[in-house]
Amino acid sequence: MNQKNSLGLNNCFLDLDDPIELFKVWMDEAKKSEPNDPNALSLATSNKNNIPSVRMVLLKEFNQKGFVFYTNLNSQKGNELKENPNAAMCFHWKSLLRQIRISGTITQVEDSVADQYYNSRGYDSRIGAWASKQSKELKNRDELSNSIKEFKQKFDDINNVPRPKHWSGWNLTPTRIEFWLDGDSRIHERLNYTFDKSGNWIKSLLSP
């Protein structure tokens, strides 16, 4: 029989008051068990007309301030986040039968933070940030290939490719984090953390 924590949940939920600490534990375990991209997440956004969209992105950093990913600011998600800063993330790890949902508000990271991450990327990835007009219609693939060639000629020094102003990071400051564990006969286990007005995380159990 699986050990239980103080709330009667599987012991993988531990007994932590801080959901960021629990997220770190689960992410570390996912890195050991997931065959591909344990930091992959679905990001849900919506525009000013409340029409939703969702796509996969990669988490690049997390701490007490939030969860950070990077993108073209003029992409669909970039434009939607400018219109509506409310967003949600979902991590799903099949190898662990676990899921984490996070919702909150989005803000753009500081330029110095974006510069540091951008400069850690490979040359081709940095060129791609310049060459791709993300989410815009392409006439054909040659149009993109030619754009890549142009920017490789412009930035032929692999150590000196500046970050384009239209490319940066977003930080999601969480107001709600839910941890989910698959259960027999769909009797799943769910632990919810909500950030209250006094600045504390409040734990609660949710029905499957």
What do the PLM-derived regions correspond to, one by one?
Residues 1-208:
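Binding-site signature for planar aromatic cofactors or substrates
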